[in-house]
Each structure stands twice: as C-alpha cells, then as structure tokens.
C-alpha cells in the first residue's frame, strides 16, 4: 500500500466514532458467519407491532429466486420514521427545506411532519386509496413530496416516485406499468431559476388511453402558475388538508409487504420497476445511514439527491427519519444563483455531513476555488460521494477544497436494486484511497468472477457479484419476476450480478470500474442505451441508432449517438438539434445526446448484432484498439466511421 495514496483514519475521528476498526472487523465477521444472529440483533432498532421469529429465508438459485427477511413480523414504516420520535424528539427539526430561491426556507419539526402526514394519509383514504394501491408521485423537491411518501407508507399504499425531469411519455409508461390509481404532482417545479410544467406534463401523460387506471390527480400549489384544470379529476392538495383529521392510526404491515416501486433504466429498453418491501429495506437504510455517515443525534445532514432517485428515498427520507435525524431537502441545483450555492447552504444551516455526486463536485471543481470563496465551512465534519465512481482528481479536490483536509470522504457504491450502501468506507474504521469504495458493509459478501462465473481470488479485476442476500435487497421487478431473475441471477448462477465491473487491490479494497452491460451512468443517473435508441429511431427521419457512453468532464459519462438516416434524408446541424430535442421530449433532458455522429451504416455481426465495443472505441478515438473485426458483416463500415469521427474532431 503506497503511503502517498493512503489517508489513515484521523485520531480525532477514531476517538468519537460509532465504528472503529476493531468494531468493524468484529461486526462484519459476525454478520457473514452468523447473519441470523447479527440481523436479529440489528432489527431491534425498529419498533415492531408483531415481533418476527424467522430472520432470513433467501435463495439465489435461478430456478427459485426468493428473498424474505423477518417475514412473520409486522410494523409500519411511517410509525418508525415519525411517531416513535415524538415523545423525545417531537420539537426536533426533521426537515430543513431550502428553496430554489435562496430567500426561501422552512424548518419542519417531527411533530409538524407527523401531523401533516396523518392529514394527507386521511386525505388519500378519502380518495379511495387503500393498502396495496399504487400512487405515483411526480413532484419537485418540496416537503410535500416527503409527506406524500410517508402518507402512502402510513396507510399501506405503494408509492412510485417519478423524477420531475422525466417527460410526459416517460411518466405515462411508468403509470401504465404499475396501474397507478392516483398521481400527486405540483402546478410547476422550480429548479435553477427555471419553471418546469409538472401539472401540464401529467395532463399530457394522461391523454394516453392506457393510463385509465388513474382516478384522481392531487396538485400541490408551488408557483401559483396558470394550469389547466379537470374538475372531475383534479384536486388541490391544500384543500384536502384543510378538512382532514390529524389523527390517523398507522396500518399494520407485514415485513414483506411492498413499500415502493422505483423505475430504473434497463439494458432492454423498458424501465424496470424495482420493488422494495417494508422491514428489511427500512432496517438497512437506517443502519447504513447511521454507520456510514457516523451519524450522531443533533447533527445536520444534507444529501443533495432528488427524491425521484433511490438515493433520495434511502438517504433523504427513510434512513435519516428512521434515525430521528435532521435531513436537509434542497429544491435547487448546485450552481444557482451561482457556484457558491452549496457552500452558502452549508454555512446557512451549519451542515455537518454532505452527501453529493461526483457530477456536482466536478461542476464546482471546474470553477477552481470560486465555489468556496467567502465560505466558512467549519461545521462540516464528513463528506460523501454517490452515483458513480469518483475519479482521484475530483476526490482530492473535494477533500482539500470543500473539506479543508479535515473531513473523511465516504465514497459509497450501491444501486437502486440494493436499497442501501453495499461497499463504502466507515469514517472511523477505514483508511481511505481516493477513487476506491473500499470495503463491504455488514452482511455484504462481494466477489469477483470471470466471464464464465469462476470466482477470482486475491488482487484481480472481474465482474462484481454479491454471494448472499442482505435485508435491503430488492425482492423483484414489479409484475415481472422472470425479468428480475433473468437480469440479476441468470448470468452467474447462485449469485447476484450487479452489472458492474470492479477490481480488488492487494488490501482487499474494491474499485468500481463501471457498467459492463448497456447501461450508461450520466450525472449519476442510470440511462439504458436501448431506451435512448428506441426514442431516437421513433423519429421519422431516423432508420437506426446506436448509443454508447463516452467520458465527460462534468457528467462522468456523456451520451454518444451514431445515427443512420432514412434514404433521401440529408444530415445537417439543424437535424442534429431536432434529434436532441426529440429525445428530450421522449425521455427527458437527462437523456439529451452530447454527440451525434452520422453513420451510413453500423458495424454488425452476421447475425445482426451491433458491435458496441467498436463504437465505443471509435467514439473515444481509440482507433488502434478495435480488436477483432473479422466477424463483421461489412468491415468497411468501420473505416468510414473512423474517418467521420476524425473529421468531427478536427472541426
């Protein structure tokens, strides 16, 4: 281990930590040798209505994949996040809300949040929402989004939060897949000083005849902007609350009853409805939040994610609130009104823990030290990174410039499907290496396998798999268990395949090398190449499209699209712009292509399979590293693409 790249645990951190090195080793050992005993003990941190007797019933056998934790116990998630804190922490701030406009902020106590959640839970019941019904939440980053999630959990409804940046078409697809009964939205969203037409997007989504399961649309007033109104379907959020009782008994839920669906991009195009259940998910979110962030009562914790992504679910809402923490909810973006926004929020609210994405870090880093000019930052004691691997340069900048060399960085690796953090340093236990996610969390058994599924020992690189279940693991894909099995358990039998590659160094530290399937990681958000390709070929002028990821200074991965036009169509800059706007409309701004290269043909095998490996190499100008092209039906296509790429780069 080279001393230059190693950041040992700081003595002052080790002295006050919840988990030092000896504790980590002892707890990790117990968690993998005796998972039943370990998780039985950890589950006592939750309040149960009916205690469980059986801890773990799990099988990764691809003929009968079945994952159950604490299956005969009952509890309620909202009770665990709210009610049980009222006696001792009722007047503690649960949510600090920071608006897009720096002049707007609110503080909401646990008692106030509990009252509003109960009112809205009663309002949902009044709209015929009951246990097992699906509610779609398409909201800006405002407290009402959290209220809606917890209100669903309180009455046993299943929430499906859809990121407010998704287009009406993408929203409709997600509503149709889960037969959503109610949609909760806002008149408009505010982000970076711009308004987003959320209610108008819902209206457009619901013109799709297949969305007929939706009975009501509940609208929260955010901007007061003018919107269309369907008096038979639309209801104001605030008018419902005005007449609702603040008393609502939490529904007794089985440990394995569904809590939420969250759609994530798949390599086959159609988004996957990742299904999480009640007890195991909540326990895992709470325990990882406490131990990874070394959270202590009274601290101000800020995760910059959106609740439309799993990071927002686990580490803005459920993990922090289950722990009685103060969680900061930010409506805006890191560079509005200017690049100092993050630093100003840290100082304004005396933030102790900052959990953000490499995309935001790179955006601040691009401005040098401007982002911290005039900032104090002395409240910070811990930094976190999530969404994609952080390159060592960005890690160093984050550590030196934002953390002033005083704050450990927890570089966390996990997925929508994992429910919570799987590989991460613990600040009081783990010596840090910039760019490494380091070591597994309790109960997590990672391994590397070659392409045939053979385990690789020692320092090596391979496909990252997990050998046994953990409580936060997704149980299925909504309405499609076969796809769940095919996606995660068929590639390497008896193991959970993450879809990521990794290397393990001589100290047993893991370094995530990125996706090995056709899924891109754009600004920490997963985008399926097939989803973007499908949107592109839906354009009347496009015959064929192939999407690959390329390195991007700000986003981590950029979207590079090769486009073959229909006969008679001519390439032009105007058409490039038209295609970019088309994809934005079909999927959302997040999927907007960074590069479009015209291609008279694509490199295909004789069976018709597009050789994306070759397209990736051309997109990154690695012309001499194309590998074997003898299997191509028309090898001449490759040289044409290389020539075009060189011309584009020279332009």
Curated annotation (Swiss-Prot):
Modified how: Acetylated. Deacetylation by the SIR2-homolog deacetylase activates the enzyme.
Record's signal peptide: none
A GO cellular component annotation in the UniProt record: cytosol
UniProt entry tagged with the keyword Metal-binding: yes
Family annotation (SUPFAM superfamilies): Acetyl-CoA synthetase-like
Catalytic activity: acetate + ATP + CoA = acetyl-CoA + AMP + diphosphate
Alphabetized GO MF terms: acetate-CoA ligase activity; AMP binding; ATP binding; metal ion binding
Keywords: Acetylation, ATP-binding, Ligase, Magnesium, Metal-binding, Nucleotide-binding
Binding annotation for ATP: 387-389, 411-416, 500, 515, 526
Magnesium listed as a keyword: yes
N6-acetyllysine modification, residue list: 609
One Pfam assignment: ACAS_N
GO biological process, one term: acetyl-CoA biosynthetic process from acetate
Superkingdom assignment: Bacteria
Enzyme Commission number(s) of this protein: 6.2.1.1
Residue sites binding Mg(2+) per the record: 537, 539, 542
Binding-site residues, CoA: 191-194, 311, 335, 523, 584
UniProt cofactor(s): Mg(2+)
Function of the molecule: Catalyzes the conversion of acetate into acetyl-CoA (AcCoA), an essential intermediate at the junction of anabolic and catabolic pathways. AcsA undergoes a two-step reaction. In the first half reaction, AcsA combines acetate with ATP to form acetyl-adenylate (AcAMP) intermediate. In the second half reaction, it can then transfer the acetyl group from AcAMP to the sulfhydryl group of CoA, forming the product AcCoA.
The family this protein is said to belong to: Belongs to the ATP-dependent AMP-binding enzyme family.
Protein name (record): Acetyl-coenzyme A synthetase
Natural source organism: Pseudomonas savastanoi pv. phaseolicola (strain 1448A / Race 6)
